[in-house]
């Protein structure tokens, strides 16, 4: 199990801007990842997120917990068998679910039928990683630009300079992927 502080700036962009950035930076390879969200009202109250990310037939269980700047991510590599058991509401014990015990939550208690698939393109920079994402969820699609950084001040300035080239502005982060997914579910009721 590993922990890291995720600090990122992110905005929604249009398909045209998405394609322009990929063209400008001559990005020729991308990869797909699918986030399976494990939802529960207690996590929503805490503003925590629990997900399983599938990428290249590898699986990672992640608990995200908000901090003053960014999110504390606690990650655990799991196998497909464990992922399938969690999705089927079977009891699993591991370090991530141990963190949820104080809230009387276990692996059997989550809504597990919502997922989001991202086609991700990346640009490495001196301050972090720019991700140009095409997201598909619940019959919808959107385009997102994320900048995952290690130094808040230097990273923010780099991000502002980067998006300025595309006549984009930044005030605050757009809604998270899970928030957009939940909103789409509520709109379909």
Where are the regions a protein language model picked out?
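Phosphate-end processing signature that detects enzymes handling 5′-triphosphorylated RNA
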Residues: 1-189
């Amino acid at each position: 199990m590993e922990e890291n502080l995720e600090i990122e700036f992110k905005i929604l962009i249009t398909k045209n801007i998405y394609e322009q950035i990929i063209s400008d930076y001559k990005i020729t390879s991308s990869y797909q990842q699918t986030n399976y969200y494990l939802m529960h009202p207690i996590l929503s109250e805490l503003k925590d997120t629990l997900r399983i990310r599938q990428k290249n037939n590898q699986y990672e269980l992640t608990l995200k917990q908000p901090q003053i700047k960014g999110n504390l991510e606690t990650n655990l590599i799991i196998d497909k068998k464990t992922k399938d058991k969690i999705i089927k509401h079977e009891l699993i014990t591991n370090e991530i679910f141990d963190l949820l015990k104080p809230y009387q939550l276990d692996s059997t208690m989550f809504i597990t039928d919502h997922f989001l698939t991202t086609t991700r393109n990346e640009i490495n920079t001196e301050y972090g990683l720019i991700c140009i994402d095409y997201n598909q969820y619940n019959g919808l699609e959107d385009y997102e630009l994320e900048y995952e950084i290690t130094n808040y001040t230097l990273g923010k300035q780099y991000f502002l300079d980067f998006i300025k080239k595309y006549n984009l502005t930044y005030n605050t982060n757009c809604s998270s992927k899970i928030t957009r997914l939940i909103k789409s579910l509520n709109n379909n009721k």
